Regions:
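Extracellular and organelle-lumenal recognition/adhesion modules and their flexible linkers in secreted
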Residues: 1-306, 311-349, 367, 384-394, ...
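Loop/turn elements at helix/coil->beta-strand transitions in domains of secreted/extracellular proteins
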Residues: 14-18, 295-299, 364-369, 432-435, ...
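Conserved, mostly hydrophobic/aromatic
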Residues: 20, 153, 296, 361, ...
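Aromatic/acidic polysaccharide-binding cleft in carbohydrate-active enzymes
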Residues: 25, 376-379, 534-626, 630-648
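Acidic/polar loop patches that form or flank catalytic/metal-binding clefts of enzymes
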Residues: 30, 52-55, 300-302, 465-470, ...
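An active-site-proximal structural segment forming one wall of the substrate-binding cleft
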Residues: 277-297, 350, 354-360, 364, ...
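Active-site neighborhood of glycoside hydrolase catalytic domains
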Residues: 405, 409, 413-415, 425-436, ...
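C-terminal beta-sandwich/jelly-roll accessory domains of carbohydrate-active enzymes
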Residues: 667-751
């Protein structure tokens, strides 16, 4: 028999202990959280040339601008046009453009259709986000019968007349949605000597002066007149059947016709925040947001992750490229392309940018934790890290200024701050309440420490209470982290960090680990001896996927119950030490099936459904049952029944109901008989000696290899069904005898 006793309060529990870490990996943003189903929606796609990532020097990580990728043009032709394009090293190259794009940074497609072809109608199609590889030919627009979908596109008629029909069809070309239509007529002379290319030199004239007539043919369609001859068409369509399909835009013209196309959007009309005017740009997929919301995250870290650093100069995440109108956002290839099934087809559209991340934080009631580039490219093994010169004007002016401008964007007064005015004009005049910021991701070494100091000092000169998060590097081992931790503790000891920060710390240090379940269980006592000196811990990326232990990263071995148990054991240690462990977050958060660059993730999804993994269920059990006070826990065992595989934590509230959340993790293959002593945790804290105590017990248990699964089609399966029991004890001094199942996580809630 093992006796578990809940004792006196030890400290205030960190109010930010459980958060989420979002990075656009595994198509977590485009194809996932981004509600728009159109792949390369704006003809601005920039991709990794996957043949170059194994090369060396300047030939490595080359950029491939492919503005028409993921679009098929049948019986019509298309040209990519714009005033700039990405070069092979990511540089912006000026190009000739016969007519203005919607924004100077953007490109568009000029589409020409001749008289009707004998082979059939003219149309263009987009399959959506199917993950590529063997799945590259599959349609990915998820349609549900009788559901409403929003269609939006920007059109500029150039020549001739046509009717454009927009809708989703199945793999056989049969309608999956109703069709919406718009017509245009260009009342002008035929094309001159540019007819061979289909380009006009005077396309930039105002719509009202160009002899253009355009109108929706559907009662629910609407036309909005834009600049430079552009029109915005918005309409709704209705699902006819439930299936995956592809977007089709059919061109019905009795003569040669040319039009420009940009910003094509198709999404579920019931996106997250529908009807809220602040969600006027990027839109979010509701079921994914609701799955994240169910974790009750205290914070949201964004946008990563290694994409913060990028893999080569120019590939770093630049937050200023992600705000403003959608057309103004400068796309970038994702460094995670090399992990994709086809090795390259991963462009960051930035339809979800920093503004959308801040709005999501607000809706989730989670504090924002943006993390910015610190002047050092990704330092992971096998990469080619480049260091920006710390003495350069670019670093001292532009790089540091990015941090200061972001704080103004988030918190500033729109009347006096230009970046705060951008926030206001995007739909959010009120500040977002930013109180912490990450400086680099998984960076380490003397150069990083020097850059961290320069950045944090500039921040604290203006915003002394802003909490700066410092990286401990890639690996969770003391020798690797020593430089960062020594420096952080020195800053805290010399009063050189933040003053009166939100967590009370001078500085936070970000540790990461992707180790084995056994390692995580062994680290439940990791923080017991960490100094309480004003330098707090953020365990910012963790997953018991066995990567650091050299274990194969396979689909079969990912997200097993064994991995979730190891993580649960570790989290009991984080709760017990939440006076120094301020924040934790799992990574990666989201993964598209089959676009998984990492095998193990917290939440998986396909175009239609969500799969909360067993790891998610453990995370949710912990994050939704956390008190504001942590209590001492003792485990008394006999020699014949050792409890070395038992891990316990207890938090609660010192209110009238004296609520306690007691978490017990058994990672062994044997049941454990436990006596839970509640007297020290209840009667000793003022509960009436004669008042009954209500106990609610929830147990998650399964075979170590158990896991949930989801395919490209269909719903998830294999979910662990919680076992729930309720008891009433006659008084707070009573003991509860219970059997803790093997391979289990048990939550006892006492009131």
């Amino acid at each position: 028999m093992v006796r578990i006793s809940v004792g006196s309060p030890t400290h205030h529990t960190s109010g930010r202990l459980y958060g989420v870490f979002f990075e656009d990996i595994n198509h977590g943003a485009d194809g996932g959280l981004n509600a728009n189903m159109v792949n390369n929606y704006s003809f601005d796609g920039v991709y990794l040339d996957h043949h170059t990532w194994r090369m060396a020097g300047a030939e490595r990580w080359r950029t491939q601008a492919d503005s028409l990728r993921f679009w098929d043009f049948i019986n019509c032709s298309a040209a990519s046009l714009g005033s700039e394009i990405r070069g092979i090293h990511g540089q912006r190259v000026t190009t000739d453009c016969p007519a203005p794009p919607i924004h100077a940074h953007s490109r568009y497609a000029r589409i020409t259709s001749d008289v009707p072809s004998e082979t059939g109608p003219a149309y263009l199609e987009n399959l959506g986000y199917n993950g590529g590889g063997d799945n590259g030919g599959e349609p990915a627009f998820s349609i549900v019968a009788d559901h409403t979908y929003s269609v939006s596109l920007a059109v500029r008629p150039v020549h001739g007349r046509a009717e454009l029909s927009v809708g989703v069809v199945d793999r056989y070309g049969l309608p999956l949605t109703s069709i919406t239509r718009l017509s245009y007529i260009v009342d002008s002379d035929p094309l001159d000597d540019t007819e061979e290319t289909g380009l006009r030199q005077d396309d930039g004239a105002d719509a009202q002066d160009s002899g253009v007539s355009i109108s929706p043919d559907s009662s629910d369609g609407a036309i909005v007149i834009g600049r430079d001859g552009w029109y915005r068409f918005n309409a709704d369509v209705t699902g006819l059947n439930t299936d995956y399909g592809k977007l089709r835009i059919t061109i019905d013209a009795g003569e040669r016709t040319t039009f420009d196309l940009d910003l094509v959007q198709f999404m579920d009309a019931d996106y997250w925040g529908a009807g809220d005017p602040k969600w006027r740009y990027g839109k979010l997929r509701r079921d994914l947001v609701e799955t994240i919301q169910a974790l009750h995250p205290a914070f949201l870290r964004f946008p990563g992750g290694c994409i913060v650093e990028g893999v080569t100069p120019g590939n770093e995440y630049r937050w200023k490229d992600t705000v403003g109108s959608l057309a103004a956002r400068r796309q970038q290839y994702s460094m995670w392309s090399f992990k994709m099934p086809d090795g390259s087809s991963y462009s960051q559209s930035y339809q979800i940018g920093f503004y959308e991340y801040f709005c999501l934080c607000e809706d989730l009631k989670a504090k924002p934790l943006p993390t910015l580039f610190a002047g050092i490219a990704c330092q992971s093994p096998g990469r080619d890290p480049r260091h920006m010169d710390i003495n350069s004007a670019t670093f001292r002016s532009n790089m540091i200024q990015d941090y200061l401008d972001l704080i103004e964007f988030a918190n500033g007064d729109p009347e006096s701050s230009s970046w705060a005015a951008v926030r206001r004009d995007m739909g959010h005049p009120e500040p977002f309440g930013l109180d912490m910021i990450g400086v680099g991701n998984e960076n380490f070494g003397a150069d990083y420490v020097a850059k961290f100091d320069m950045i944090s000092e500039a921040i604290h000169e203006r915003y002394p209470d802003m909490l700066c998060v410092m990286s401990a590097g890639l690996f969770p081992f003391q020798p690797a982290m020593k430089r960062s931790w020594d420096h952080a503790r020195t800053l805290a000891a010399t009063d050189s960090g933040a003053h009166d920060s939100a967590t009370g710390d001078a500085i936070i240090v970000d540790e990461h680990s992707y180790h084995s379940p056994e390692w995580f269980a062994s680290q439940a006592s990791r923080f017991d001896a960490y100094p309480r000196c004003g330098a707090g811990v953020y365990f910012g990326e963790y997953s018991a996927n066995g990567y650091f232990a050299g274990q194969p990263q396979t689909e079969q071995g990912a997200n097993t119950w064994k991995s979730a148990l190891g993580e649960a054991a570790f989290l009991t240690g984080c709760e017990r030490n939440s006076d120094v462990v301020r924040m934790t977050s799992y990574a990666p958060l989201l993964a598209h099936i089959p676009a998984k660059g990492w095998a193990q993730n917290l939440i998986e999804f396909n175009p239609a459904h969500v799969n909360p993994t067993v790891n998610y269920e453990v995370e949710r059990l912990f994050s939704t049952h956390l008190g504001d006070t942590t209590y001492a826990v003792s485990i008394e065992q006999t020699a014949s029944r050792p409890a070395k595989h038992l891990y316990v934590s207890a938090t609660g509230h010192d209110r009238d109901d004296a609520c306690r959340y007691i978490k017990i993790v058994n990672i062994s293959d044997s049941p454990v008989d436990v006596t839970l002593e509640i007297a020290r945790g209840l009667a000793g804290l003022g509960a009436s000696p004669s008042r009954p105590v209500r106990l609610e017990v929830t147990t998650l248990s399964a075979n170590p290899t158990a896991k949930t699964t989801i395919g490209y089609r269909g719903e998830a399966s294999g979910a662990i069904v919680p076992e729930r029991r309720a008891y009433t004890l006659p008084s707070p001094s009573s003991l509860l005898a219970m059997k803790i199942k093997p391979y289990s996580v048990t939550l006892v809630v006492s009131r």
